[in-house]
Amino acid sequence: MIQQETRLKVADNSGAREILTIKVLGGSGRKFANIGDVIVASVKQATPGGAVKKGDVVKAVIVRTKTGARRPDGSYIKFDDNAAVIIRDDKTPRGTRIFGPVARELREGGYMKIVSLAPEVL
């Protein structure tokens, strides 16, 4: 579960390395986000020469969480880190590569470009 002030790894090559959650989108009193949810975040660490800079406010979709997600068949999927991919308003990623595995739940959320770029979908 990702909430306000949570720091996340960035799993793409947009130039950001770490982001801090500002707000969870999707409802007025929503406190937590899970895999496939969109957040507004601030870039805390960035690589030089990247598309996004430190201090930029960006939208991101969560692709991995330590808490994990429950599947309809009763199984759970958990990851070793909390990670997100920076996206544009039309749900396409800002970067051109995705690093690490992503969850299958992104396919139902309409993030097919992220799923197709990912090296592994679990």
Curated annotation (Swiss-Prot):
Annotated GO MF terms: large ribosomal subunit rRNA binding; structural constituent of ribosome
Keyword Hydrolase listed: no
GO CC term, one of those recorded: cytosolic large ribosomal subunit
Gene Ontology BP annotations: translation
One Pfam family in the UniProt entry: Ribosomal_L14
Keywords tagged on the record: Ribonucleoprotein, Ribosomal protein, RNA-binding, rRNA-binding
Keyword RNA-binding in annotation: yes
Domain of life: Bacteria
Gene3D superfamilies linked to this entry: Ribosomal protein L14
Membership in a protein family: Belongs to the universal ribosomal protein uL14 family.
Task performed by this protein: Binds to 23S rRNA. Forms part of two intersubunit bridges in the 70S ribosome.
Complex formation: Part of the 50S ribosomal subunit. Forms a cluster with proteins L3 and L19. In the 70S ribosome, L14 and L19 interact and together make contacts with the 16S rRNA in bridges B5 and B8.
The protein's name in its UniProt record: Large ribosomal subunit protein uL14
Species the sequence originates in: Streptococcus agalactiae serotype V (strain ATCC BAA-611 / 2603 V/R)
